[in-house]
Amino acid sequence: MKRLVALMLALVMSLALVACGSKPAETPSDNSDATENTDGIKIGIITLNMEAQYWLDVVAGLRSVIESNGGTVVHYSSENDVQKAVQQIEDMIVKEFDYIAVTCVDKQGLHPALVQAHDAGIPVITYDKTTDDTDLVLTQIQTNDYDIGFYMGNLMAEYLKEEGKVMSVTTPSVSVSDRNRGFQEAIDQYPNMELIMGEAANALAETTLPVVESILQVNPDVIGWLGISETQSMGAISAIEAAGMLGQVTIIDMSASPTSLSFVKEGKQEVTIDQQAYQIGVLIGESALKNSNGEDVESYIAVPWYAITKDNVEEYEAMVAERSK
């Protein structure tokens, strides 16, 4: 097991340009009350919400670059609503922002707003959830959803010695679908394994919990959970714990949340994956600064992930603490 984790860590870390980890997030700014610096660029960033640590870490990484260069960051939340995201982009266009960063909650629904920003001469950077309208954006920054799902599925197979039922929950999100496709295609390689896929409207804890409860009621012999986000895993772990199965179900998720890190240290969870949200924010900021200085920016920037296990969790936490100083 250590061999596979070490191999994957070596692979993804060889791609990294800077140290990994997530920095504890700052309190998000109110949309209308950001303190503006007039010397640098002004960039607005739209996240899916202002609660999940992942999104807060992206914003913190962006702030670390832009504000240290005399610029301003304004944080918007679409609340997973594409129409709200469109309105927020239109608001930034009217207010003549220099750059816009957005995670694409709906590729087709966001298209008109991307056209408006392009026509207004405002460069758009997509991150995490990207767009097919590559001609309308400056760059796209993300971890590859399918690849990380495929890695997690294979890792689960090794933990379970290639036998047993594994569960996950999908949502209409394209990125979630890609991750779950990776899960499925990895698990399909093992004839003695089965992936049970539930469905939910979104990846929030409150919508995931009843879905996982239902899966466990029908399939009490499930021995693995593959989670695609912090909030989703919060709901799943609550259901697993309520069923008295915490410690019996192998848990691998994309979270790196304080709860997941604690569970890893306590041996209640095997692996949690850090998508390097803070680094995604840093790359957004660096891309905007490069463009503002007339430098070339890659059209697609792949961000490596970091697998956290009981063997390296303390090292990971020390790295995060160092970055927060």
Please tell me what each predicted stretch does:
Residues K2-K23:
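Sec-dependent N-terminal signal peptides of Gram-positive bacterial secreted proteins and lipoproteins
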Residues C20-K325:
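A residue-level marker of the well-folded mature domains of exported/periplasmic proteins
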